[in-house]
Amino acid sequence: MSFKCIFLTGGVVSSLGKGLTAASLALLLERQGLKVAMLKLDPYLNVDPGTMNPYEHGEVYVTNDGIETDLDLGHYHRFSSVNLSRYSTATSGQIYARVIKKERDGLYLGSTVQVIPHITNEIIEVILECARENHPDVLIVEIGGTVGDIESLPFLEAIRQFRYEHAEDCFSIHMTYVPYLQAAGEVKTKPTQHSVQSLRSIGIIPDAILCRSEAPLSSEVKKKISLFCNVPSTAVFNVVDVEHSIYEMPLMLSQEKISTFITEKLGLFTKKEDLSDWEMLVERLRHPLPNKIRLGLVGKYVQHKDAYKSVFESITHAALSLNCSVELFPLDSDDPHFLETLELCDGCLVPGGFGSRGWEGKIIAAKLCRERGIPYFGICLGMQVLVVEYARHVLHLEHANSTEMDKDTPDPVICMLDWQASLIATGGTMRLGAYPCALSPGSKVYAMYGQPEIMERHRHRYEVNFNYIQQLKDHGLDIVGTCPEQGLCEIVEIKDHPWMIGVQFHPEFLSKLIKPHPLFVGFIEAALLHSRNKTYV
């Protein structure tokens, strides 16, 4: 086999941080000079997470080629330089759909189609497709869910078969949770033992066990896990809960020397990993920064932090680059009192979303920011909020709205794209993926990007209505970014406002700790400037 494969499974409980672990491993292996590809296998039956409730699933991360994926791919992007595409993700829904299509097309020649071998063979094919597309030295495959879940069984069986065929080129990591019982005053290894037993009963013997814990595990505990899980004590690794930031994770794994252990077992010759730049950034995150701002994030999923995961991380990246700490206030736009908090903030960010709930509250927030000179950053739906508010209160189109919120509005300043009007199905009908955007010289965004054309990722159905663009321009709303191919409005700025910008795309999908997105940097800079004229109470 021309590549090595690392499989990452999880046990005991969900939400262990397998995605962060996989992303951190990718960073470490890249810093050792290896080319890495990544694949997330999700056992749920949805074809993709595009129509799943953000409260249940968190945000939907979009790739350049327009695939709606799990938020873990956002971690992969922010930590590493891996190429993420349609080959980087697969769900049970996709796997079953592929198999059923082949059966309908007669490709199984009348065979009885079963989970084994047809579903498992298709899972193996997905793994090989990812490798063929990316030509990596190492492919990291994260399996969602928890060992013992019935929906994970086909994926684990496929991995067992793959390891059997390519034993010398595969490495299996099982991640578990080792709880500390305060009443007993000790950690308990039994859940880890049972989880590994479940994995071994399927036929997968882990090459390493990665134990998540609240405090460092003693050598005695590691030896106990080694003995009862039948792995060498040198293959039992420990990561504790991070103190300050998720970006500490690669440094923890580096201290455990897990990447070196993996490369030696796989026979890979690598250079010593250099994390000096990462260490410097993390060290700054651990200490108070000289500047401080307050930001209000106005949305409708604010009770669930993962719903806006990439936005939160992008704010962290930009603020760190400016030696700034951010006190972030998640504000529910349905809360009748949220404006009281927003008035105290140095900036307001309205992220993407769908549906009418909370819509009017967001428009009120945009009006407050416009009238008081508070920096405002509208992303996707947040840009549409800006445009509708401007149309209502500056153009005096009292009933201006988006047809998503009011299909009978007399002034549809935001409307569905013509080519989508005839589509009925909800899934897969949006403008998805990376599109070019031409910037207007002399605009704020041109100064931030420093180039005439950019590529940004989209996920939306509605656009600024061409019929209202000239009116908006005449009243001071500049269209400073357009799609060269279709002339669609992609970026707006209010001419006489310190910093009020809306973008139809999702810049948060491109930000990294080591390379903050210029729009977020510009937004934080504007908020810092605004804060100098305020006194905190």
Swiss-Prot record:
UTP binds at S14, K188, T189, K190, P191, T192, Q193, K224. Transmembrane segments: none annotated. Residues 1-268 are annotated as: Amidoligase domain. It comes from the Bacteria. Its EC number is 6.3.4.2. Homotetramer. This is CTP synthase. The lineage of its organism: Bacteria, Pseudomonadati, Chlamydiota, Chlamydiia, Chlamydiales.
